[in-house]
């Protein structure tokens, strides 16, 4: 039965998402900004209606977003830079927001003077350009209105999207295509596991480009086409695809949004009462989460290329972990870890680095957060069973990321 989410639950979603997004999903929005956009929507009578998979009409049309966002090399960034970046101590524009339309227009005019002259038929993307992919997909499928959007992953930046759903009158489906975590590639989806067709899809960039993906070999090829587009567009590209409601009910992972809210609510309550947010998270997870390491940050290594951010996180153990070291490799999200140089927790299980005092998960997209000596706790979160199948491991296991490491379930590693 549908549930109307409260302001507290929406704010709790952001904290829960930061704790579950495995270092990815962008950066943490400013707390006051989240409160403002939620309050504005509620003041206008907008409802945040959470529905279960079972409540989706079988013959309805559901949209979901394909996309990738990360980084490109400095040389590529200089050609098509679509944002000022996320390197400021404050977290940069991923947190604060900025006038992207004005920024893109300035960049296009600069390119027009140098290496990319505009044509007589060129059109600069306007403030409504963000809806271009949505509108084109509707045309392709016979102008069918979507009943709702299926969330692709758990991300702290999703709160802005949820507010957008409320303004459009769309319900929030209590489900995702990746479970209760973030993932770096659109191919890492339960829709892929269940062979849901990805075409047609509409892909756009911030530069006014729109492409219809009419046919492709596989989800993996679609993802790599998208990555190529992103690489030569400043690091971001994406757009919607459509699915019939009955297929969403069969293929998506239920309960991911409510699970995230539950985690965030428990952590916020612990912080407000002077308790331990890590213990609160693990208790609220009901057997899904494990305290996997405790220590302090030694360093973070950060590289941008091919539409992603890549690197390593180095942690030095403290307390009961004194004398031990943890290394984590990430591609947007954390995927492989080594305890004292031996394979430890890996994807598809989640690896989350969290500040035990504030309860906020640390974001790989915000390098300034990773201060040397900062105290952290690593919480591992068990993957859903579908990710532990043969096809699931091909998509989210160590070998998908070119690491020849056998996957071992977290519950067999951390007791």
Name each model feature, range by range:
Residues 11-70, 361-384:
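N-terminal low-complexity or amphipathic/hydrophobic leaders
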Residues 233-247, 278-282, 291, 385-392:
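Flexible, glycine/charged-enriched surface loops at secondary-structure junctions
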Residues 13-34, 155-175, 179-182:
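Conserved phosphate/anionic-ligand binding catalytic regions in large, soluble enzymes, centered on
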Residues 263-318:
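Oxyanion-binding "anion nests"
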